[in-house]
């Protein structure tokens, strides 16, 4: 049985950990939910919460009432691939917005309806709260809370819980231009692998996600499973590519995201 961080002695370039392992779980979960964060932030900014259908994949409909909350529906129907990240999704997400997302304490809450991303069914709680401007650099600051289940086609699943701070490090001054956005992600997460092994994770250095890039481009994640050695995923030096390293004890393995 594969349990914690998987140690290899001969492989030099591999996929980002077997999906049964703790590092595989966090790569899948972080990718899934950060992709949704990027999508929602982009469309809310671009739409200005105006009523109407605003996209094709997904179909995006914003319903504006005379007062908050308002709702935005993202509908992938029976399935389509996003032009931004190439990921095929199906089903629906409804985002309820309690107030303008530049007002402190406004909350955006996701509801999942038969939502599937890359073949995996997603359910649970996902919330984004605006905390105001960060002290020192005035970056917009958001709290991200997730408690979710990711179910695979074979009906096995992983549990994932995350509490992050998402900082809008670049691009907040140009709200209608999404491509120049850069986000820094800090926090902690925990979960249970497909094989029932608990793990926790922290971020020794903030993970950076550029809107112009499909992958995390820098930062690191320290993963500690309840069984086996800890490991670190290092996303690199800022270059936009699908490469990272997995460090387990004295071994460093190149991985492809």
Predicted regions and their residues:
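C-terminal motif of bacterial Sec signal peptides marking the signal peptidase cleavage site
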Residues: 2-4
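Low-complexity, intrinsically disordered segments exposed to solvent
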Residues: 6-257
């Amino acid at each position: 049985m594969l349990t914690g961080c998987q140690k290899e002695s001969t492989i030099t370039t591999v996929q980002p950990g077997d999906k049964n392992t703790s590092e595989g779980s966090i790569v899948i979960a972080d990718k899934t939910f950060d992709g949704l964060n990027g999508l929602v932030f982009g469309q809310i900014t671009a739409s200005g919460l105006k009523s109407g259908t605003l996209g094709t994949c997904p179909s995006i409909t914003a319903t504006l009432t005379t007062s908050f909350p308002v709702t935005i529906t993202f509908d992938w129907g029976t399935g389509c691939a996003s032009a931004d990240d190439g990921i095929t999704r199906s089903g629906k997400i409804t985002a309820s917005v309690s107030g303008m997302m530049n007002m402190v304490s406004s909350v955006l809450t996701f509801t999942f309806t038969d939502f599937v991303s890359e073949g995996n069914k997603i359910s649970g709680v996902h919330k984004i709260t605006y905390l105001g401007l960060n002290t020192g650099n005035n970056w917009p600051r958001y709290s991200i809370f997730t408690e979710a289940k990711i179910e695979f086609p074979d009906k096995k699943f992983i549990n994932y819980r995350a509490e992050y701070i998402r900082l809008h490090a670049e691009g907040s001054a140009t709200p209608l231009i999404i491509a120049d956005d850069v986000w820094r992600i800090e926090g902690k997460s925990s979960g249970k692998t497909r094989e029932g092994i608990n793990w926790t994770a922290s971020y020794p250095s903030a993970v950076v996600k550029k809107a112009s890039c499909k992958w995390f481009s820098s930062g690191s994640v320290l993963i500690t499973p309840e069984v086996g050695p800890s490991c670190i995923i290092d996303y690199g030096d800022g270059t936009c590519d699908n490469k990272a390293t997995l460090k387990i004890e004295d071994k460093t393995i190149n991985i492809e995201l």
